Amino acid sequence: MKPDAHHVKQFLLRLQDDICQKLSAVDGANFVEDSWRREAGGGGRSRVLRNGGIFEQAGVNFSHVHGDAMPASATAHRPELAGRSFEAMGVSLVVHPHNPYIPTSHANVRFFIAEKPGADPVWWFGGGFDLTPYYGFEEDAVHWHRTARDLCQPFGDDVYPRYKKWCDDYFFLKHRNEQRGIGGLFFDDLNTPDFDHCFAFMQAVGNGYTEAYLPIVERRKAMVWGERERNFQLYRRGRYVEFNLVWDRGTLFGLQTGGRTESILMSMPPLVRWEYDWQPEAGSPEAALSEFIQVRDWI
């Protein structure tokens, strides 16, 4: 089957609805929607839940942008895209809970296609999901990775190990020499063996996010926490900000190409703190995190 951007868009809109509905059902609060238009072509729906019962902030963004020509920054690395019209669409989300025992989660799925008359389209899918705990629980990590493995299984035995490694490699803070979290799945430039296969995998990843995350939320939401745990959560959120602003390709590309800043920075935690040369107390649960987020086979 030839690439069908319309079907992808319809799936992404339904996915945004589904994820927002499930997060709201767990939290009790509702998302506020901000629909926006892009002057150069396209637009999106940004939805944010603030100060809910469980989630301090959850942002779920859908965007669909298109144009007659790719920005120069994009064609510099992919000269085959020069002179082509393009469409780029996706759903991206980040959830920052109040409770430090509930991890932060991130997911996105996206599709890109560039076309010109008389030539085959250039297209690919990308996406994934990853988990950033503040306090490590092995059963949560095993569930997260088992869900990732199980959704990958129908697409081949090598898919989960390959995309897990890509995720571990990608969500790494080089300036800190540490992982952002315990990873999950990350894939990009997926266009083989054919459109139907790739689209099915992207759908599996998108639909798998809530299956991976919400059982962890339910398991941890009643755990009692205090000022110590909150301060550590805010400190570790600093790593999240550092990664997004220094290393994340999507954030940098969006800001450098005139993307919608409010939507791009929706992933930022609402509160965060830095403290010069802070070190956790030896033997404490906070100190245990650095070992917990080391790359390993969880299943």
Swiss-Prot record:
Chain positions of site Important for dimerization: 175
Keyword Cell cycle: no
Listed EC numbers: 1.3.3.3
GO MF annotation terms: coproporphyrinogen oxidase activity; metal ion binding; protein homodimerization activity
Chief location: cytoplasm
Catalysed conversion reaction: coproporphyrinogen III + O2 + 2 H(+) = protoporphyrinogen IX + 2 CO2 + 2 H2O
Active site residues per record: 106 (proton donor)
Family listed: Belongs to the aerobic coproporphyrinogen-III oxidase family.
HAMAP family per record: Coprogen_oxidas
Protein name as catalogued: Oxygen-dependent coproporphyrinogen-III oxidase
Organism ancestry: Bacteria, Pseudomonadati, Pseudomonadota, Gammaproteobacteria, Enterobacterales
